[in-house]
Amino acid sequence: IGPAAQIGIALWLLLLLGVKGLAPILLENNSKDSRAFADDIKPMLPGHPNQVIFVEDMSRNGLNLYLQTNIKKVSFEPRPKPISDSAFDSSLAQELAQPADQRLFIMKREMEQAFLAGVQASGRTPRKLGEWIEKEKPSDRDRMIYTLDNEFATR
């Protein structure tokens, strides 16, 4: 490899390292930054969740890295699950029929009333842990965070 190629490779490596170093700064206020989301909600949690369940919402699968937990998505209505896969793992009613497992339920503000109705219909008691308000963003991006009675019972 000639001197020009060596300089080109060195510049390319510097560019790659620079982009890698700048990415966290550029993503700092990004709503899809799972690390920031996890850091924001950790103080609300009554313990370590075994499952984070997104109700009629986009899941943030990166939370499994920062909370060391399983991520699920549920819908209000049962939806057929094709062989290949489905956008939702189950319905809210199916999830609520499962035994307590230190679950968190996260949803957009506009889904909160439907979630509460579904939980109450199942005979369970919802417990609001808090709200995640995304900084400097419209309120339609706020997320409500719930658990259920006896989900985080002391062992």
Task: Name the predicted role of every residue range.
Residues W12-G118, T125-K128, W132-S139, M144-N150:
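Short periplasmic/luminal acceptor-recognition loop of GT-C membrane glycosyltransferases, typified by
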